[in-house]
């Protein structure tokens, strides 16, 4: 296997531990024809078939993921198994401190039952096999990641996104691959490694990486910057690229490199999430990948640190389910949804939208209804269930501070909530990003986050910046936009009935304490987890003495 890997030592440990895992016949999942068959396979694959009254428990119990997370130091001091332990950590969405991350032990049984089959299905359905190559990019590591030592004993720590793809490499064993961090995707040395691969069938990278290649200005800037940071040993391809830049100049050479990269990757399938892609960005990606509209080749996926690969738009090659933005639920765990405190298995659910709860085994212990904090929508639950590819985050309490405008008054003692879905006593707010997009399109508003403030026991303030088109500086217009963009009658009526006051201020309502570039540098240097980069569309402030407002 030809590999260009920024950490081959970690991959070697995973290969030694997991390369003998038997492959799964994931194509048979697509032949599942009934809910009963799906449930039976879920119980068999997950190991939950041995759990008494599993269906009853799956409609009544719930598990906080922190209850089975590990104290890293305590776990390592007591570890006694013969193989190198591997731990994965969360992305730090709720807390910006590395010390606050949740850690999970990746036991061999969990990898065999959940991670290996799911990742094999995702990549093989995208076209990767032992005769083809893969281009893979992963998040910048935190400072604790990689092959580490505790009291002279080795252990491996990784984001689940890096771990999952390294497990996949151990199982599928492609003939060649590149494996680097997102931040180096436009580095000339990394590009030269991609040029050294043949038969590239899969690119696993976020949309921003592809867009970075597709944007010639950004690509040129980063290629030029990377010339100051080239390795001492330069492979022949890299030497040729450097010579071309010297001869043609950076602008012309970057254009040639972009065209070669586009051609090199044009037969590949991209594995990425498409939820946040605008049509403009889609067009950039189509042009770079040489795709016709309606003939895009990509695979969407949903993987969580607590449970592994849960769903993906796997297929037998037509990618139609991907283009519909749907995902098949893998029969590797037992999943339920919770709607208004009622829990139902997704294979039996009458309610089609709710909070995702997933049951799996952890060694000999059954973890029933792990609360992942995400909201899913079921599109089909006869046979192999299908869910909407847009997974939204239920509201959660932030554990780091933000900067609020001094143009309004906030409570003395309060909590901050963020997310995509807020269930409040008097109304629900679902996908507020849609409202921001409408404000940008209809009102020329330059804002990426709004603020909802509980101003007193009876009412709220929904705060907007006033640097918008004058036609939008009216409550009536805001009501129209909320009605047309969010389709949430309770919220609209709340404004009409003065439960929610519309407030305009000559300032941005909310922002990070540091600049975006400062935070990004911290993440890239491993000083902060990547979750801190997420700017949520809505932040909600609730006084601590009024916490029962959020349900």
Report the location of each language-model feature:
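Short loop/turn segments at strand-loop or loop-helix junctions that form parts
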Residues: 89-92, 137-141, 203-208, 466
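"Short basic amphipathic alpha-helical interaction patches in structured regions
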Residues: 101-109, 114-117, 149-152, 218, ...
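Conserved AMP-binding loop of ANL adenylate-forming enzymes
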Residues: 118-166
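Short beta-strand->loop structural element characteristic of the AMP-binding/adenylate-forming
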Residues: 100-102, 157-158, 162-184
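Conserved helicase ATPase motor motifs in RecA-like P-loop NTPase domains
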Residues: 87-94, 276
């Amino acid at each position: 296997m030809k590999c260009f890997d920024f950490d081959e030592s970690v991959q070697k440990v995973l290969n030694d531990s997991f390369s003998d895992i038997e492959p799964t016949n994931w194509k048979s999942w697509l032949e599942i024809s009934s809910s009963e068959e799906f449930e039976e396979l879920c119980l068999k694959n997950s190991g939950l078939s041995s759990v008494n009254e599993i269906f009853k428990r799956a409609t009544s119990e719930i598990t906080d993921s922190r209850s089975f997370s590990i104290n890293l130091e305590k776990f390592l001091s007591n570890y006694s198994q013969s193989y190198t332990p591997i731990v994965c950590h969360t992305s730090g969405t709720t807390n910006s401190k590395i010390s606050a991350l949740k850690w999970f032990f990746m036991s061999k049984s969990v990898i065999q039952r959940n991670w290996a089959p799911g990742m094999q299905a995702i990549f093989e359905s995208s076209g990767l096999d032992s005769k083809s190559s893969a281009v893979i990019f992963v998040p910048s590591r935190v400072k604790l990641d990689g092959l580490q030592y505790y009291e002279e004993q080795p252990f491996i720590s990784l984001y689940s996104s890096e771990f999952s793809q390294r497990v996949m490499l151990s199982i599928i064993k492609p003939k060649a691959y590149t494996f680097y961090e997102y931040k180096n995707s436009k580095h000339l040395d990394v590009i030269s490694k991609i040029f050294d691969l043949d038969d590239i069938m899969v690119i696993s990278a976020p949309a921003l990486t592809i867009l970075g290649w597709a944007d010639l200005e950004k690509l040129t800037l980063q290629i030029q910057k990377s010339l100051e940071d080239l390795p001492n040993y330069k492979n022949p391809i890299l030497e040729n690229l450097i010579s071309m830049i010297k001869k043609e100049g950076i602008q012309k050479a970057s254009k040639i490199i972009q065209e070669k990269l586009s051609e090199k990757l044009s037969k590949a399938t991209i594995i990425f999430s498409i939820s946040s892609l605008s049509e403009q960005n889609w067009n950039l990606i189509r042009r770079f990948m040489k795709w016709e509209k309606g003939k895009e080749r990509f695979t969407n996926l949903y993987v969580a640190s607590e449970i592994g690969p849960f769903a993906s738009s796997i297929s037998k090659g037509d990618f139609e389910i991907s283009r519909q933005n749907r995902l098949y639920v893998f029969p590797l765990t037992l999943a339920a949804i919770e709607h208004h405190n009622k829990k139902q298995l997704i294979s039996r659910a009458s309610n089609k939208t709710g909070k995702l709860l997933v049951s799996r085994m952890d060694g000999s212990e059954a973890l029933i209804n792990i609360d992942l904090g995400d909201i899913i929508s079921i599109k089909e639950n006869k046979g192999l269930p299908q869910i909407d590819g847009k997974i939204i985050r239920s509201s959660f309490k932030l554990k780091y501070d933000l900067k609020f405008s001094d143009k309004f008054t906030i409570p003395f003692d309060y909590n901050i909530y963020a997310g995509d879905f807020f269930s409040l006593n008097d109304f629900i707010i679902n996908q507020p990003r849609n409202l921001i997009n409408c404000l940008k399109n209809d009102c020329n508003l330059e804002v990426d986050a709004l603020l909802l403030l509980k101003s007193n026991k009876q009412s709220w303030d929904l705060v907007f910046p006033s640097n918008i088109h004058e036609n939008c500086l009216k409550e009536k217009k805001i009501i129209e936009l909320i009605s047309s963009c969010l389709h949430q009658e309770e919220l609209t009526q709340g404004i009409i009935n003065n439960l929610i006051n519309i407030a305009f201020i000559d300032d941005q309502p909310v922002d990070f304490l540091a600049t975006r570039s400062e935070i990004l540098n911290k993440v890239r240097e491993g000083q902060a987890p990547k979750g801190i980069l997420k700017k949520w569309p809505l932040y909600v402030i609730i006084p601590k003495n009024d916490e029962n407002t959020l349900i």
